[in-house]
A protein has these predicted regions:
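Hydrophobic, glycine- and aromatic-enriched re-entrant/interface helices and adjoining loop segments
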Residues: 160-166, 170-173, 260-355, 374-381
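Hydrophobic alpha-helical segments of polytopic membrane proteins
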Residues: 214-277
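Transmembrane alpha-helix boundary/anchor motif
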Residues: 64-68, 187, 273, 277-281, ...
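Interfacial segments of multi-pass membrane proteins
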Residues: 241-260, 326-351, 409-422
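Membrane-helix boundary/helix-loop-helix interface segments in multi-pass membrane proteins
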Residues: 7-59, 64-234, 397-411, 416, ...
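Hydrophobic alpha-helical transmembrane segments
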Residues: 57-62, 116-122, 345-364
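Long, low-complexity, intrinsically disordered segments
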Residues: 466-526
Length: 526
């Protein structure tokens, strides 16, 4: 009997109905979005919107496209990731359509639907073409170079609403920083995975914190400082805060040292205080946050933040109903930065709770997929991408609710913004790919030629016909950093000390009594 598959169910029973569950959830997500679309039309125009059928058909086609890509290339992926993304995207489209009724001359929902289609198309391309997420590890330095280049380019373009984050060419505009955040996350994950042992165990100890050696931590800190510096020059402090949060999370996951969280919070507070004093654009936002009702007292009317707070208060527990709010009073950026205020007013605390649970579930499944892997790069990549979504939701929701200063970022999938929705779909595609690797069942030991002897060690007169890198991803003997190396991905390490008794992907093998220990115990009792 072979150890890895002794208790495994037959191959046909390992993943019962996973894609069927996903398809059913997708149908529910499309149905909820279409019903909300119709509800808005009935509330505002006393009639079903004329394009409701085409809207539903388009959203269903996008959901089906994503489902087919996952079914054929990532059959073991988490069945919740794609439906949650489709539901969030559908809710965003119906909210933008609802706000378009307030500004008929400036309709944004058709354009947003096109961007959503492009995002789902890229989702399918990534899932179909990226067969192994470890491929990205080979292009770590290409990723950081491309990411920094994308962040530098907007400096040479005019500022829009006080920030230099846009590139406008022939009426077409996009935010390159949205794509840069994925590229820099790939670099951070690859670099920290390759150097995690040195980061965790070398360096000087100060107070109760052990700091890594400068030669190890220096390159990644330099890249982070450059990226944050560029963002400060562009006055895009929301994205700089996002990079900082993700960097601290990845550093903690790579080293396992909680002290980095404390250091990160202290540095964030110091940096925010310094920039808030030195940068007028940021200083005004901090002043609005500290005194949101000052403009009312001065007789200038309510500020955007004050109107946002009034909208949340008007929503109460159950909301005013879709299409029954007064979000137009927010004015500028009601479809982007302040779209959450519309959601809170019309669906209330109950709707907000459901929305935040969707985001929490999406982030949690991303973390789960990463932590189920024994590949350090895959683990850090999934955690980093999920953290991008988590920090972004916190920064935006905290800003419009008055918990922190406004940052001008876009709520994932919900707010108007083509660059944002496309980037978020790529993030979900990468999480789907990592999830498929983490959930893929074990191969048959007879097929791989790996025969387990006593204690889980390999035995046999001849070597197995497959090397570790020849097996499907996750079927190796230890941490697969892309070259069969252990603990950091350095090649050439022997497999003897790689936790041979553990199943791949972080799934622990069942505890079995050691016969030699039993004999020793019996002898001592005699």
């Amino acid at each position: 009997m072979t150890a890895p598959t002794a208790d495994a169910p037959p191959p046909g029973l390992r993943m019962p109905g996973r894609r069927g569950t996903e398809l059913a959830l997708l149908a529910g997500a499309v149905l909820i979005s279409v019903c909300g679309y119709i509800d808005v039309g009935l509330a505002r125009q006393n009639a079903v919107p004329g394009d409701a059928a085409s809207y539903g058909a388009g959203l269903a086609a996008l959901a089906l496209l994503g489902h087919l890509a996952v079914r054929f290339r990532a059959p073991y992926a988490d069945p919740l990731l794609l439906p949650i993304a489709i539901l969030l995207n559908g809710l965003g489209l119906l909210l933008i359509f609802r706000l378009d009724l307030e500004t008929p001359a400036d309709r944004a929902s058709p354009t947003q639907l096109v961007w959503s289609a492009l995002g789902v198309g890229l989702f399918a391309v990534v899932v179909l073409l990226l067969r192994d997420h470890r491929t990205l590890q080979r292009y770590a330095y290409v990723s950081v170079a491309a990411g920094l280049a994308l962040m530098v380019v907007p400096i040479f373009f005019p500022a829009v609403n006080g920030a230099k984050i846009w590139i406008r060419v022939a009426g077409f505009s996009f935010q390159p920083g949205e794509f840069a955040k994925i590229l820099l996350t790939v670099f951070f994950a690859a670099y920290l995975a390759a150097n995690r042992s040195a980061l965790a165990h070398t360096g000087k100890r100060m107070w109760k914190l052990q700091f890594p050696a400068g030669r190890v931590l220096g390159p990644v800190v330099a890249v982070w400082l450059v990226s944050v510096g560029v963002l400060v020059l562009e006055r895009d402090l929301g994205t700089s805060l996002l990079f900082f949060g993700v960097f601290v999370v990845l550093l903690y996951v790579a080293t396992g040292r909680t002290g980095w969280i404390a250091v990160g919070l202290l540095l964030a507070a110091a940096g925010a205080a310094a920039v808030g004093v030195l940068e007028p654009h940021v200083h005004s936002r901090v002043a609005d946050w500290l005194h949101p009702f000052a403009s009312i007292t001065a007789g200038r009317g309510a500020s955007q933040l004050a109107q946002s707070l009034f909208a949340f208060a008007a929503g109460g527990l159950l909301g005013t109903g879709l299409g029954e709010g007064h979000s137009a009073l927010i004015g500028f950026a009601m479809k982007s930065d302040f779209i959450l205020a519309t959601y809170g007013e019309e669906l209330g605390l109950t709707g907000l709770t459901a929305l935040f649970l969707l985001y929490a579930l999406l982030v949690a499944r991303g973390f789960r997929a990463g932590l189920a892997l024994r590949d350090p790069f895959g683990r850090l990549l999934a955690v980093g991408l999920a953290s991008l979504l988590a920090v972004q939701v916190f920064v935006i929701a905290g800003g419009v609710m008055g918990l922190i200063p406004l940052t001008g970022m876009a709520m994932p999938f919900l707010a108007q913004g083509g660059s944002s929705v496309v980037t978020n779909w790529v993030i979900v595609a990468l999480l789907v790919r990592v999830s498929d690797s983490a959930r893929r069942p074990l191969p048959d030991a007879a097929a791989t030629g790996v025969i387990a002897g006593p204690g889980g060690a390999r035995s046999g007169a001849s070597a197995p016909p497959y090397e570790e890198d020849d097996l499907p991803y996750g079927y190796g003997y230890g941490y697969g950093g892309g070259g069969g190396g252990g603990d950091g991905g350095s090649p050439g390490d022997p497999p003897d000390g790689r936790d041979a008794g553990h199943a791949p992907h972080g799934r622990s093998a069942p505890d079995t009594p050691d016969s030699s220990d039993d004999h020793d115990d019996q002898g001592s009792r005699r």
